[in-house]
Structures are given as structure tokens and as C-alpha cells.
Amino acid sequence: MGRRYFKSLVYGPVFSNLGLLVFYEIFKFLEEALERHKDSLIGDLLIPGMARTIALESDLAHYLGEEWQKDYVMREEVSDYLKHLNQLEESDPYLLCPYVYHLYMGLFSGGQVLKAKRMLSLSSIAGLKEDDDGGEKPGYSVTNYGDVPIGSLKRQLKKAMNELAENLDEETREQMLVQSAKVFEMNNVIIGSVKGVDR
């Protein structure tokens, strides 16, 4: 996942039109799944302040217009990803946990650095700059966690994931390891569908 995952969310039209859009459905599904299973150990992974669905919708509305969903057609690669997640939830919801962990940890770890790089990149292209009052520029909600420290989110998610794994049987833990590798494969597929991202 690494560099390509982060890059797909950052630069120019890839960020505004494609990077956000292909991952929007994935984050939305995972957050809805966490809510569906909130009364189990899985629910512990939904750390307060972590959810990104509303932020993604805000950014997409900024870049694509308020009625962006009217003409939105899901990419086949994204549809396949969602089918895979649905199958996992039906067979064993705990197998969704590696997707939650890796996707959000990736956003936590790289989001702030890439936010700064994106600002520099877009300012050189379109003359964008931070608001005079120091406020958040519209379109950057996905990397804005407000007053919630990124380090705290990372520690809480890691702790919740470790505690969850400790309470599962060996077979389930092994299956989760398999899905941990699958996360990178699935992400690379949808990233590869985004034009302008190095393959």
C-alpha cells in the first residue's frame, strides 16, 4: 500500500476526482460495519474522532459539487472490493478488522505529511494558500482531525486491535493475517484504476 496509497489521495485531480472517490466507499462500508457490530469486540475499533465518511463527503462536495452523487458511477474495482468486504462480513465479521486497522493507520501516519505536501503542490498550480485567519482550507477535511491528536488515535486503535486479537482463537487470528496481506492487494487494485498514479 505505502507510497501509492498515500499518493492516490494527494495530488491535483487525482486527489479531487479519483483518490478520494475510490476510497470513499471503502471507508464508508467499514464505518457502517463497525456500527453494525458495535456490541462486539469489533466495535472497539471505532475510536471517537476516527470516522472519515462525513469528511470525505465534504471534500468530494467541495471538489465535485454538492450534487456529485447524482452522476456518480462506482468503479468496477471498487465494487469488487466491496463485494469482498461483504463476503467477509457474512462469513466472519472479525476478518474486516485488518482492513480497518491498515486503512486508518495509513491515513493517520501519512495524512498530515501529505496534507502539507498537497498544499504546496496545489499552491504552485492554482495559487492556493491557507486562509488569512489560519483556518482550514475547504477540501482538506479528510486529513483534519480537529483537536484530536493523531498520536492518540494511533495508540488507541493499536491497543484496541491488540486486545481484540488476544480474545480470538488461533484459527481466526491466522485468517486475519491472510486478510492483512489481502488489504494491500485490494488497495493496489483500486489505486491502479486511478489515472495519473504511477504503476
Model-assigned labels for residue ranges:
Residues 1-199:
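Metal- and O2-centered redox machinery and metal/ROS homeostasis
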